UniProtKB/Swiss-Prot annotation:
Effect of H147 to L/E: 100% activity loss
Subcellular location: Endoplasmic reticulum membrane
Reaction catalysis annotation: a Delta(7)-sterol + 2 Fe(II)-[cytochrome b5] + O2 + 2 H(+) = a Delta(5),Delta(7)-sterol + 2 Fe(III)-[cytochrome b5] + 2 H2O
Protein name per its UniProtKB record: Delta(7)-sterol-C5(6)-desaturase 1
Keyword Protease: no
Domain of life, per lineage: Eukaryota
Species this protein is from: Arabidopsis thaliana
Pfam family for this entry, one: FA_hydroxylase
Gene assigned in the entry: STE1
Motif (Histidine box-1): 147-151
Main location: endoplasmic reticulum
Length: 281
């Protein structure tokens, strides 16, 4: 038992270290040090998530909409400031709830309820990468079906997912739309990351990093720029999802859509649009 407690303390020490790093640079000590460990962790996740959302979003928008204007997107496809402000407002209302999920997952890990491990040396590098691959496949499968059911189950779409799908044209989508969800919707789509903890051994620090990478990834797939990197589910695929509502539910890759018959290729979409335009002429 003492050995188990000593092992679990590695997780507590690591989260406490992250709390100090973030909170000590953003808040006076008297505001956060008296808080219980759980609330410190939530506050750290909330502040870090908010900073990541705005910094990545602003840098992304500045680059593609201003430095590279008319390079990646035509000027008339750039979303309005008003649309981006609305996306920020929706995301900020949900952010306190979004960041509760990683806080709860860290708490479960600290209590030893999951298969998380503290050091890569416990399994070695080969198994580390094998477990990451299994973890990501599980997450991909889980997010695909969670996302698809949020469309197929009408009450879930009406009361949850429709909040995100008001951005249904290229000139209304921006990197800031990536987290503009109803909070319950956003949490449901991230739940596979937490369920995976009980099934697949995963390195603790890697799990935290993958959760926060979601903010970067969701910004990327809402910028409407088709990178055309197989088998990545990039923004070209996701833009089709926002316009057809019934294709490209996948997350990182196109594999789940390919397996379950919901894939629509943006290059084929362009060809179809060109053919339709020629017929109209």
């Amino acid at each position: 038992m003492a050995a188990d407690n000593a092992y679990l303390m590695q997780f507590v020490d690591e989260t406490s270290f992250y709390n100090r790093i973030v909170l000590s640079h953003l808040l006076p000590a008297n505001l956060w040090e008296p808080l219980p460990h759980f609330l410190q962790t939530w506050l750290r996740n909330y502040l870090a998530g908010t900073l990541l959302y705005f910094i990545s979003g602003f840098l992304w928008c500045f680059y593609i909409y201003y430095l590279k204007i008319n390079v990646y997107l035509p000027k008339d496809a750039i979303p309005t400031i008003k649309a981006m402000r609305l996306q920020m407002f929706v995301a900020m209302k949900a952010m306190p709830w979004y960041t509760l999920l990683p806080t709860v997952s860290e708490s479960m890990i600290e209590r030893g309820w999951t298969k998380c491990f503290a050091s890569i040396g416990e399994f070695g590098w080969i198994l580390y990468f094998v477990y990451i691959a299994i973890y990501l496949v599980f997450v991909e499968f889980g997010i695909y079906w969670m996302h698809r059911e949020l469309h197929d189950i009408k009450p879930l779409y009406k009361y949850l997912h429709a909040t995100h799908h008001i951005y249904n044209k290229q000139n209304t989508l921006s990197p800031f739309a990536g987290l503009a969800f109803h909070p319950v919707d956003g949490i449901l789509q991230a739940v596979p990351h937490v369920i995976a903890l009980f099934i697949v051994p995963i390195h603790f620090t890697t799990h935290i990093g993958l959760l926060f990478m979601e903010a970067i990834w969701t910004a990327n797939i809402h910028d409407c720029i088709h990178g055309n990197i197989w088998p990545v589910m990039g923004a070209g695929y996701h833009t089709i999802h926002h316009t057809t509502y019934k294709h490209n539910y996948g997350h990182y890759t196109i594999w789940m859509d390919w397996m379950f018959g919901s894939l629509r290729d943006p290059l084929l979409e362009e060809d179809d649009n060109k053919d339709s335009f020629k017929k109209a002429e």
